[in-house]
Structures are given as structure tokens and as C-alpha cells.
From Swiss-Prot:
Its main location: secreted. Keywords: Cell adhesion, Secreted. This is Ornatin-E. The keyword Secreted applies. InterPro entries: Ornatin. The lineage of its organism: Eukaryota, Metazoa, Spiralia, Lophotrochozoa, Annelida.
């Protein structure tokens, strides 16, 4: 389930973050982004941290 992030989270994570993550960091391809933001492409396999 993906929810709209706050403005600060938007700057960090990109457009969406994964609901239920304690650090509120977005995930790309099932892995948390530790730097940059999550770029959601067309299809989960193409999600990348940028």
C-alpha cells in the first residue's frame, strides 16, 4: 500500500513511500532507499533509488 508522503518525505523519497516502514523511507524493488529518492518506473522491477 502506498500513501502520499509529507513535503519533507517527498524531497527524500520521491512520490511515494511504502506504508508501514518504521523509518518511512521509500523502497525500490523491495529494498529501502538509504540515499537519494525512489524513482517508480513502469513495473516494480524497474524501481530504482536515484
Amino acid at each position: 500500500i502506498y500513501v502520499r508522503p509529507t513535503k519533507d518525505e517527498l524531497l527524500y523519497c520521491g512520490e511515494f513511500r511504502e506504508l508501514g516502514q518504521p523509518d518511512k523511507k521509500c523502497r525500490c524493488d523491495g529494498k529501502p532507499c538509504t540515499v537519494g529518492r525512489c524513482n517508480f518506473a513502469r513495473g516494480d522491477n524497474d524501481d530504482k533509488c536515484i
